[in-house]
Amino acid sequence: LANRLPPVAALYDLWRTRSTGLLSGGRLVLAGELALLREWLLPTGGPFLDVGTGTGVYREALGEGMVGVDPSPAFLEVAQRRRPGAYLLAHGERLPFREGAFSGVGIGPPWTEFLDPEGAAREARRVLRPGGRLFGLLLLGPGASLGLFRPTPEALLRLLEGAGFRAEVRRLGRLGLVLAEVG
């Protein structure tokens, strides 16, 4: 709920530039996250979808071929101002796109905040074309914490496979890096 407030959206980039390094125990910084995102998704050719785009950080890696969706009008306003491009108000569990519309989907840290993480994984799979790829980064558990989805790597792998992905989950400190392909 707090993430929908304008002050949180305005200050989010300050947290985002530091959080990857802090939560990964220094194993990955934001620049490294964006490099991995590019390396994993760009070879698919685009277009790309960023689910839970927030302030549009992934646009720095994916460029104009990216569409960002977020349920927060405040975040989308900041995204459009800081990283102009195509953004839509939408939830990751109910994406407003046709089946197979994208070659790559990125889901960053907001994955932990989905009310239905399994539904979000199924939706990501639905909008990916055959051979499409998913990139994800999220806080690992074990278990939910303060209402956040925080799976173990094994539970996350089962969730992704259940949604139709062949996936790899790498633990980086408290973060899980997801590299998945349509199965």
Protein language model regions, located:
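Conserved beta-strand signature within the Rossmann-like core of class I S-adenosyl-L-methionine
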Residues: G132-L139
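Short alpha-helix
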Residues: L148-A163
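Class I SAM-dependent methyltransferase SAM/SAH-binding core
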Residues: L49-R94
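A short SAM/SAH-binding and catalytic strip from SAM-dependent methyltransferases
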Residues: G104-D116
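A short acidic, Gly/Pro-enriched loop at the edge of an enzyme's catalytic core
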Residues: E93-V105
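A short glycine-rich, Lys/Arg-flanked "PGG" loop and its adjoining helix->strand segment in the class I
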Residues: E118-P130
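Core SAM-dependent methyltransferase catalytic element
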Residues: A163-F165, V169-G183
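Conserved class I S-adenosyl-L-methionine
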Residues: L1-P43, V57-Y58, F75, P142-A144
